[in-house]
Amino acid sequence: MIKLMKYLKKSAGYIVLIIALLFLQAYCDLSLPDYTSKIINVGIQQKGIEDSVPDKLRDSTLQNLQIFMDEDQKKEVSQNYTQEEDTWVLNDDISKETRENLNEDFSKAMMMVSAFSEDSEQGQAMVAQMGLPEGTDPLTALAQMPEEAVQQIMSQVDEKLKDMPESIVTQAGVSFVASEYEALGKDVDAIQMHYILMSGIRMLAMALVIMLAAISVTFISARVAGRLGHDLRNSIYRKVMSFSSREYHKFSTASLITRSTNDVQQVQQVMAMMFRIVLYAPILGIGGVIKVLNTDSSMTWILGVAVGLILIVIFVLFQVAMPKFTILQTLIDRLNLVSREILTGIPVIRAFSREKHEEDRFEKANLDLTKTNLFVNRCMTFMMPIMMLIMNGVSVLIIYSGAHAVDNGTMQVGNVMAFIQYAMQIIMSFLMITAMSIMLPRANVAALRIDEVLKTEVSIQDPETPVHPSESVKGEIEFDHVSFAYPEAGENVLTDISFKAKKGQTIAVIGSTGSGKSTLINLIPRYYDVTKGSVKVDGVDVRDMTQKELRDKLGYVPQKGVLFSGTIDSNIRYGKPEITDAQVKEAAEVAQATEFIDTKPEKYKSPVSQGGTNVSGGQKQRLSIARAIAKEPEIFIFDDSFSALDFKTDSQLRKALKEYTKDATTVIVAQRISTILGADQIIVLDDGHMAGIGTHKELMANCEVYQQIARSQLSEEELA
């Protein structure tokens, strides 16, 4: 997958936006457990009172609290409270740090006031110890004590507070504040309801932000992934179009189709999910760990156990399943190849009654793919149940440990609830990555297969400084001691071929099957590069010209006619779309195609199906010839392109073609000597060597191979 990351450069801005939205979503997601904790701890247990800092308190209460404060604490309280008659009101503009200091000051003092209140055992014991009358207010007695004695009491209290859980100190302070509010006539229930309501509204706002962020990320991710798929398909197409025949033979057609469709789709789907899940999971997981450490560090070992178990499960499953993902894509290629062969070869299969054999062949390819798919899916079905078992086990363990912590006073119920939610978020982040891990290996294999195509070195490339042919020389072909061997082949297919064709000449190539006729003409458009020697067009080596400039000069008609889906008109215009309707008709007339075109209701607008399956072999060849004629090239190349024509049509076509191509060079590969008797030069090939060259008459006089071919096809009267 990493190898294809360069194709995301265009979407860098969108990716940054996605990451920003994911951070926003994670922040809101991680805030919800905190709000839940506060609703339970503060809203329910503390009646909506957040800390020990009262918004308002009586003057008498403040005087009692100040008994247990030092001078600095008294000064800080007086600076942040304003006296209104017999009450003190907290200022509105205090900072968070100041409030924390006040909370610490008030918490200790409130515990002391509660401890030495008139109805407390400790207060009554102190009154009795001091010999004061029964019913004396302990706090009044403390106020009359020397400051040193009070400080000594405070020191003893501080020692006890060190071992006391913070939650107990907080609860004591909050209870004191609630009692003070009730004494002042404030509605504590209203305070509680207001706190819960406002927290709920904030949670709803957070949920709305999460929803909007998730929708936005999904939308943008789909857009980025769609663009990636588009760019990959374009890149594969451009790369494949630049392939020479050597590279085409490296990849099967079925494999190239699979790579540009199924493999790209795999990468596109995973990329869309990766932005939503793979990027989000670590953000959520790391954020959850930070929140857990802030909540309570005594239970983090539970998360360590959970994460360790998850990693072990993932590792084991991947060791088993990963090799199969690679095999899976190969088997898909194989199934596509078999399907394509069967579908394109149905007439032959039926003719030889091989339906059962092909059915078995398809069944084997299908069964192999099914077995591998089942193996992978069976492995992955274990993953989610095991993960859920770990998740539920962690929940039980947290509740068990948390219950003990609550019982000991070291945690509040809300903190336990928050810890569970954070733990679930951390585990869920691993679950999300695990879910992606089912698709990632297969997508990674698909990405590697795509990259294999894109990284393939093209053997035939344009020169850095191309040479342009002279305008004075047109339609000239020269083979100069050309030898050629197919890549990785031991022997030459062509050896030391030399000839020259000038403008207006017709060159025919004849020979037995496998003698190298088609190979020879494939060197002219540079489908292959020669092994030795050179092929020149218009006086320039084809390797020194750009492929476009070279092929613009050629009108090529392959041995097997190839048509494209569209209309007859679009197929004839294929090489030169800008030609007029009159030129289209003229090309069809020369190719003897008007005979069947005019019989169709829609004439030139008649549809042609993919591969030209709705026209006969002869009609396909004539339309292919018309396409080459319409291009008006300097050089015509016919690779046994008249084989599907009857003698009458063949004769009429050659006669019209000779007149039309009198100013162009024509190269014809032929099987029948009768069709090339009038050629200016006939090249005779025998096992890759040039057995002879000349006119029909010259070859009959001095070329034994040509004589054998001629006598096998024509009678003595025809030869004479």
Outline where the language-model segments fall:
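Membrane-integrated ABC transporters
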Residues: M1-L32, T36-M203, V209, A213, ...
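Hydrophobic alpha-helical transmembrane bundles that constitute the permease/transmembrane domains
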Residues: S11, F23-S31, L204-I215, V267-V270, ...
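Short intracellular "coupling" helices and adjacent cytoplasmic loop segments at the cytosolic face
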Residues: I44-D51, R58-L65, D70, P138-P146, ...
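An intracellular "coupling" helix at the cytosolic face of ABC transporter transmembrane type-1 domains
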Residues: G135, P146, I153, S245-R246, ...
